[in-house]
């Protein structure tokens, strides 16, 4: 019997909408050297015909550097390229439907925004992480209202109460300068876009973010 994978704690990189695969591969390598454990490939403007080809190259770069790959929204792309899992939002297919399609070993994470009741529903569907945010003002989602950090503490208690192995993920406007309070509040993982990949030194930024975990 195989053991179901566990979503790792630590730095969780989320890509900007980059089309340049060389740039992306180099960034993944640098972030991995700095301690990134998982990457979410998120490209909201990628044309459908290019998506599988790009995702396959991102997977190659991730696995070459010991990084797990999550695909944002598109579980069929995750299935096609053999990604490690998928991140789904409120308007995407349910975790139960995704699990049925991808099988028991796929990692599935969900956006819970600032809604602890939604998190409870998602944990009942066996997700591998529940993500909350935006934690701070974010250029990625400029109109999102920041979420009280106390939601992370509530989420950690909820996970313990349900006996789940799910991780608590914080996302939104996170940088090395504001990361530690989120970990102290209960975040197992920090999902970072601009604070990692738009930094002048990606490896150094990854190391600084990883340092927040002690």
What are these model-predicted stretches?
Residues 1-95, 100-128, 144, 150, ...:
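Conserved N-terminal beta1-alpha1 strand-loop-helix module at the mouth
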Residues 135-138:
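A short, flexible beta-alpha/helix-coil linker loop
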């Amino acid at each position: 019997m195989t053991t179901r994978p566990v979503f790792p704690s630590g730095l969780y990189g989320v890509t900007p909408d980059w089309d340049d695969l060389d740039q992306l591969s180099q960034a993944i390598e640098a972030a991995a050297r700095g301690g990134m454990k998982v990457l979410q490939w998120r490209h909201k403007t990628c044309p459908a015909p290019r998506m599988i080809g790009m995702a396959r190259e991102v997977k190659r770069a991730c696995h070459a550097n010991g990084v797990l790959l999550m695909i944002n929204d598109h579980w069929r792309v995750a299935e096609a390229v053999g990604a490690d899992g998928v991140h789904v939002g409120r308007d995407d297919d349910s975790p139960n439907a995704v699990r049925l399609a991808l099988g028991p070993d796929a990692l599935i994470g969900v956006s819970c925004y600032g809604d602890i009741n939604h998190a409870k529903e998602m944990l009942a569907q066996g997700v591998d992480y529940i993500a909350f945010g935006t934690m701070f003002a974010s250029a990625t989602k400029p109109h999102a209202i920041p979420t009280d950090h106390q939601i992370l503490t509530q989420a950690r208690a909820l996970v313990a109460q349900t006996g789940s192995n799910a991780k608590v993920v914080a996302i939104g406007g996170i940088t090395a300068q504001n990361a530690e309070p989120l970990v102290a509040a209960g975040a197992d993982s920090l999902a970072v876009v601009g604070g990692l990949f738009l930094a002048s030194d990606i490896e150094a930024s990854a190391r600084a973010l990883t340092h927040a975990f002690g």
